Amino acid sequence: MTFSLIRRGATGSAAVAALVVAVACQERGKDGKLLDTPTSGNIRVAVDETLRPIIAAHIDSFQGLYPAAKVRPTYAPEAEAIAGFMASDSVRDVVAARRLTTEEEAELQKQHIIPVQTRVAIDGVAVIVHPTNPDSLLSVAQLAELCAGKAPEWSRLNAENKLGTVTLVFDNSASSTRRYVRDSVLRGEALASTAFATKTNEELIEYVATHPGAIGFIGVNWISDEDDAAVRGFLKKVRVAALTTKRGGATPRDFVKPYQANVALWRIRQKAEQPYYPLCRELYVISREGRAGLGTGFASFVAGDKGQRIFLKAGLVPATVPVRLVQTADDRPAPAQ
C-alpha cells in the first residue's frame, strides 16, 4: 500500500529557478566590479546551528556543482542567526526552522527589502535519553510534565525508574529546539528552572550519554542519516525516545520514533490513520536579495531537485520531492525512494 504525501509546487521554488535561468550574464555594481551571479561569487549565509549537518551537505554539493561559487556559512543559535541576517545585507540568506515574524518582515520592509521565504523540508526534534533509562516510551503530555518541572524525578512517571532527578538538556539557551519545546510542547509555559544548555549538539549528546537521568532535545538531522559514521557513533551512545500523542490507553504500536516515514505522516496528521511523529517543524531558506545573486542561486538549489534529494537521503522529508510510504511486514511505514 502506498501513500503520496508531498505535493509539488508548495514552495514556489520553480519561480526562483526561473529567475536564476533568466540571468544570462554577470551584472556590475555602481563601482564597476562584477557582482555575484546565481552560480558564482562569494557570499555569507547564516544557518541555525541545529541544522548544521544537513545544510553543510547542501553547501558542499552546491560548491561541487558550481566551482566558482563560495558560500560561507555562519552557524549560530537561531536567535543569533536571524539577528545577523536582519542586521546586515552582507548576510544574503538565513536557513531557519521558522518563518520570519510579522515584526521582522516589517523591519526589512523599512529597509526596502521584501524577503523571499522558501519552505524546503520538514525536520523533527528528537528526544534522547541514556541507554539505561527504562522510560523511552513517552506521551507528549508526559514530556510536557518533564519539561515544566512537574515531574522532577523519573519515578513520578514510573515508580520502578530509579534514575533520580530529571535533567533537561538543550544545545543552546537561544536555540530553535529550546524555542520549539517552549512553544509547541509547553504551549508557552516556562521551562523547568533546572533546564540547562550545552554549547554544541555534540556536547549535548555526550552529556546525555554520560548522565543516566538526563533527557535531551536535538534536531533529527543530527541522528537521521545512518550512512554517516558520526551519526552511527551518536546512536551507540544514546537511546532515541518514541512518542505518542495519546494521553491514555496507548499501546506500544502508538509510540513512534522520528523515522522519515513518521515525520512525513506529520504533514497529513489531520487525516493520518497511522501514528505520526508529533515534534516536527518546517525548514526555510530566507533570502533578502533584491536581484538574482548567489543567495538566490543557493536558495534555488536547496529547494530544487538536487537539494531536495539531499534531504531525502539524509532521512528528512523534502518539501517538494514526493515521498511514498510502503507498508512493511512489521506494519511500520517505510519510505520508498
Say what each PLM segment does.
Residues 2-14:
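Bacterial N-terminal signal peptides that target proteins for export
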Residues 25-67, 71-79, 83-87, 121, ...:
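Exported/periplasmic ABC-transporter solute-binding proteins
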Residues 12-22:
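Bacterial N-terminal signal peptides
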Residues 113-120, 125:
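Short, glycine-/small- and polar/acidic-enriched structural segments
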Residues 79-111, 223-228:
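Pocket-flanking alpha-helical
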Residues 112-115, 135-137:
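Peptidyl-prolyl cis-trans isomerase
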